[in-house]
Amino acid sequence: MSDRAPAGQFIDAAIGLLRRLRDEEADSIAAAGTLLADTVADGGRLFAFGAGHSSLAAQDLVYRAGGLALMNLLAVPGVVGVDVMPAPLGSALERVDGLASAVLDSSPLRAGDALLIISLSGRNALPVEMAMSARALGVKVIGVTSVAYASETKSRHASGTYLKDHCDLVLDSKIAVGDAELTHDGIPAPFAPASTVVTSALLQAVMATAATTLADRGIEPPLLRSGNVDGGHDWNARVMEQYRDRIFYRH
């Protein structure tokens, strides 16, 4: 191990992953941002879904200061973060066949919308079926996953496929299988997961690309401001009223 303290080691590992995203995923980030900008310009709606801790990155996009107001959370009860007790139930729900179809049937998603599906492993039934079913509806799907899982783990979907196999675009988070960056001789398991910070940064890079792409086309991006700065509340009220038919968290 490095002579640096564990905190420094973890931060160095996270920085290394972020640099890899910047250098290796630049084209995919640009394509994803353009896809979202196209969706906004064409009157579509934006949605984000993640199960378990992957939901944290999805939630970070919704009703976010500096973020796109049109991004809505596609919530599945029991799998949004750790909102269910006992917590392992959420992991079990990710493996239930047919749950994704039931969710989409009761959601406002329609052809012409865009859906970000965030799943670190991309191997469970829920994200795989979510991507398959959404594309069948005519929804553009961007998958955010660690591609390494497809070569180092077995799919838990009956098709034997992974999230990455059913997307219009894939963003590879580069996270190692197991999601732990550090080891120690006195600790029997690897520790210090980096997927949340890295995936959130990856998605904010996509949002920044989408906003600037819209601006370059002469379209004001529908951005929210912080409610804790003067004028922020009034600004957000105006934006949400203007796009009220494409925002579902305000009702």
Task: State where each predicted segment sits.
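Short, surface-exposed alpha-helical recognition segments that flank or form part
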Residues: 5, 20-27, 91-94, 194
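Short active-site oxyanion
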Residues: 44-46
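A short, well-structured juxtamembrane/interface segment
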Residues: 24-41, 103
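Glycine-rich phosphate-binding loops that contact phosphosugars or nucleotide phosphates
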Residues: 48-207
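Active-site phosphate/pyrophosphate-binding segments
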Residues: 24, 28-32, 66-69, 212-251
